[in-house]
Amino acid sequence: MQFTLSAVVLALAGFSAALPAESMNNGLQHQNGTPRFPVPDSLTIEQAQAKCGDQAQLSCCNKATYAGDTTDINSGILGGTLSNLIGAGSGASGLGLFDQCSKLGAQIPIVIGIPIQDILNQQCKQNIACCANSPSTASGNLVGAALPCVALGSIL
Protein backbone atom coordinates (compact mmCIF):
# COMPACT_ATOMS: atom_id res chain seq x y z
CA MET A 1 0.00 0.00 0.00
CA GLN A 2 2.80 2.43 0.87
CA PHE A 3 4.63 1.55 -2.32
CA THR A 4 1.52 2.30 -4.38
CA LEU A 5 0.97 5.63 -2.61
CA SER A 6 4.58 6.71 -3.12
CA ALA A 7 4.46 5.63 -6.78
CA VAL A 8 1.32 7.75 -7.32
CA VAL A 9 2.92 10.78 -5.64
CA LEU A 10 6.08 10.45 -7.76
CA ALA A 11 4.03 10.02 -10.94
CA LEU A 12 2.00 13.16 -10.16
CA ALA A 13 5.17 15.13 -9.39
CA GLY A 14 6.74 14.02 -12.66
CA PHE A 15 3.59 14.87 -14.60
CA SER A 16 3.29 18.34 -13.08
CA ALA A 17 6.98 19.08 -13.75
CA ALA A 18 6.59 17.97 -17.38
CA LEU A 19 3.70 20.35 -18.07
CA PRO A 20 4.81 23.47 -19.98
CA ALA A 21 4.56 26.77 -18.15
CA GLU A 22 2.31 29.52 -19.46
CA SER A 23 4.80 32.34 -19.81
CA MET A 24 3.60 35.92 -19.44
CA ASN A 25 5.50 38.24 -21.75
CA ASN A 26 6.34 41.04 -19.32
CA GLY A 27 9.98 41.27 -20.35
CA LEU A 28 11.68 44.08 -22.17
CA GLN A 29 10.04 43.48 -25.54
CA HIS A 30 6.39 42.93 -26.27
CA GLN A 31 5.18 40.13 -28.52
CA ASN A 32 5.17 42.39 -31.58
CA GLY A 33 8.91 43.12 -31.11
CA THR A 34 8.69 46.73 -29.92
CA PRO A 35 10.86 47.75 -26.94
CA ARG A 36 9.22 47.82 -23.51
CA PHE A 37 10.35 51.41 -22.86
CA PRO A 38 9.97 53.25 -26.19
CA VAL A 39 11.42 56.69 -26.82
CA PRO A 40 9.62 59.53 -28.68
CA ASP A 41 10.04 59.50 -32.46
CA SER A 42 11.32 63.10 -32.53
CA LEU A 43 14.14 62.54 -29.99
CA THR A 44 17.59 63.28 -31.42
CA ILE A 45 20.85 61.62 -30.49
CA GLU A 46 22.11 64.81 -28.81
CA GLN A 47 18.97 65.08 -26.66
CA ALA A 48 19.23 61.42 -25.68
CA GLN A 49 22.92 61.78 -24.77
CA ALA A 50 22.05 64.80 -22.62
CA LYS A 51 19.49 62.67 -20.75
CA CYS A 52 22.11 59.97 -20.17
CA GLY A 53 24.54 62.53 -18.72
CA ASP A 54 28.31 62.70 -18.84
CA GLN A 55 28.87 59.49 -16.84
CA ALA A 56 26.95 57.25 -19.27
CA GLN A 57 27.17 56.39 -22.95
CA LEU A 58 24.13 56.20 -25.23
CA SER A 59 23.94 52.64 -26.58
CA CYS A 60 21.83 50.39 -28.78
CA CYS A 61 21.43 46.92 -27.22
CA ASN A 62 20.28 43.73 -28.91
CA LYS A 63 19.44 41.74 -25.79
CA ALA A 64 17.96 42.64 -22.41
CA THR A 65 16.91 40.55 -19.44
CA TYR A 66 14.72 41.72 -16.60
CA ALA A 67 14.55 39.30 -13.67
CA GLY A 68 11.39 39.44 -11.63
CA ASP A 69 9.42 40.97 -14.50
CA THR A 70 8.44 37.61 -15.98
CA THR A 71 5.91 35.29 -14.46
CA ASP A 72 5.64 31.54 -15.00
CA ILE A 73 2.24 30.10 -14.19
CA ASN A 74 2.57 26.40 -13.44
CA SER A 75 -0.44 24.21 -12.89
CA GLY A 76 -0.53 21.04 -10.86
CA ILE A 77 0.19 20.02 -7.31
CA LEU A 78 3.96 20.44 -7.51
CA GLY A 79 4.03 22.61 -10.63
CA GLY A 80 7.23 24.60 -10.99
CA THR A 81 8.98 23.00 -8.02
CA LEU A 82 11.68 21.29 -10.03
CA SER A 83 12.16 24.17 -12.48
CA ASN A 84 12.89 26.61 -9.64
CA LEU A 85 15.41 24.19 -8.15
CA ILE A 86 17.40 23.90 -11.39
CA GLY A 87 17.38 27.63 -12.10
CA ALA A 88 14.75 27.81 -14.82
CA GLY A 89 12.34 30.08 -12.95
CA SER A 90 11.55 33.75 -13.45
CA GLY A 91 14.59 35.80 -14.41
CA ALA A 92 16.96 32.89 -14.77
CA SER A 93 19.09 34.80 -17.31
CA GLY A 94 20.04 37.73 -15.06
CA LEU A 95 18.77 40.88 -13.36
CA GLY A 96 18.04 43.97 -15.46
CA LEU A 97 21.11 43.68 -17.66
CA PHE A 98 21.53 44.71 -21.28
CA ASP A 99 23.80 42.67 -23.51
CA GLN A 100 25.29 42.99 -26.99
CA CYS A 101 25.38 46.81 -26.87
CA SER A 102 27.03 49.16 -29.35
CA LYS A 103 27.65 52.85 -28.76
CA LEU A 104 25.61 55.48 -30.58
CA GLY A 105 27.38 58.70 -31.46
CA ALA A 106 26.37 61.99 -33.03
CA GLN A 107 27.10 62.23 -36.73
CA ILE A 108 28.09 65.34 -38.66
CA PRO A 109 25.10 66.69 -40.59
CA ILE A 110 25.54 66.55 -44.35
CA VAL A 111 22.40 68.50 -45.23
CA ILE A 112 21.25 71.81 -43.73
CA GLY A 113 18.75 71.22 -40.92
CA ILE A 114 18.25 68.04 -38.92
CA PRO A 115 19.69 65.10 -40.84
CA ILE A 116 17.77 61.84 -40.92
CA GLN A 117 20.67 60.03 -39.21
CA ASP A 118 20.33 62.41 -36.23
CA ILE A 119 16.91 61.02 -35.23
CA LEU A 120 17.48 58.37 -32.56
CA ASN A 121 14.83 55.89 -33.74
CA GLN A 122 16.46 55.82 -37.19
CA GLN A 123 19.81 54.80 -35.67
CA CYS A 124 18.52 52.09 -33.30
CA LYS A 125 15.42 49.95 -33.73
CA GLN A 126 16.22 47.75 -30.68
CA ASN A 127 16.62 48.70 -27.02
CA ILE A 128 18.05 52.18 -26.47
CA ALA A 129 19.93 52.42 -23.18
CA CYS A 130 22.26 54.61 -21.14
CA CYS A 131 25.28 52.47 -20.21
CA ALA A 132 27.93 53.31 -17.63
CA ASN A 133 31.29 54.32 -19.09
CA SER A 134 32.88 51.23 -17.54
CA PRO A 135 32.39 47.85 -19.24
CA SER A 136 29.23 46.01 -18.20
CA THR A 137 30.93 42.68 -17.62
CA ALA A 138 32.26 41.28 -14.37
CA SER A 139 34.91 39.01 -15.86
CA GLY A 140 38.59 39.69 -15.39
CA ASN A 141 38.45 42.49 -12.83
CA LEU A 142 39.33 42.57 -9.16
CA VAL A 143 35.98 43.73 -7.79
CA GLY A 144 33.82 41.57 -10.06
CA ALA A 145 30.97 44.09 -10.30
CA ALA A 146 29.11 44.58 -13.56
CA LEU A 147 27.60 48.01 -14.06
CA PRO A 148 24.38 47.56 -16.04
CA CYS A 149 22.63 49.83 -18.49
CA VAL A 150 19.33 51.61 -17.91
CA ALA A 151 16.62 51.84 -20.57
CA LEU A 152 16.42 55.41 -21.89
CA GLY A 153 12.63 55.26 -22.18
CA SER A 154 12.33 54.52 -18.46
CA ILE A 155 14.07 57.78 -17.46
CA LEU A 156 12.33 60.14 -19.92
From Swiss-Prot:
Description of the deletion phenotype: Leads to the loss of hydrophobicity. Disruption of all 7 hydrophobins leads to altered germination kinetics, decreased survival under exposure to extreme cold stress and increased mycotoxins patulin and citrinin production.
GO molecular function, one term: structural constituent of cell wall
Protein localization: Secreted; Secreted, Cell wall
Signal peptide (UniProt feature, chain positions): 1-18
Keyword list, A-Z: Cell wall, Disulfide bond, Secreted, Signal
SMART domains per the UniProt record, alphabetical: HYDRO
Induction: Highly expressed during conidiophore development.
Keyword Cell wall biogenesis/degradation: no
UniProt entry tagged with the keyword Cytoplasm: no
Database matches in Pfam families: Hydrophobin
Principal place of residence: secreted
InterPro entries (UniProt xref): Hydrophobin
Any one GO cellular component localisation term in the record: fungal-type cell wall
Intrachain S-S bonds: C52-C130, C60-C124, C61-C101, C131-C149
Function: Aerial growth, conidiation, and dispersal of filamentous fungi in the environment rely upon a capability of their secreting small amphipathic proteins called hydrophobins (HPBs) with low sequence identity. Class I can self-assemble into an outermost layer of rodlet bundles on aerial cell surfaces, conferring cellular hydrophobicity that supports fungal growth, development and dispersal; whereas Class II form highly ordered films at water-air interfaces through intermolecular interactions but contribute nothing to the rodlet structure.
Family, as annotated: Belongs to the fungal hydrophobin family.
Designated name of the protein: Class I hydrophobin B
Biological classification of the source: Eukaryota, Fungi, Dikarya, Ascomycota, Pezizomycotina
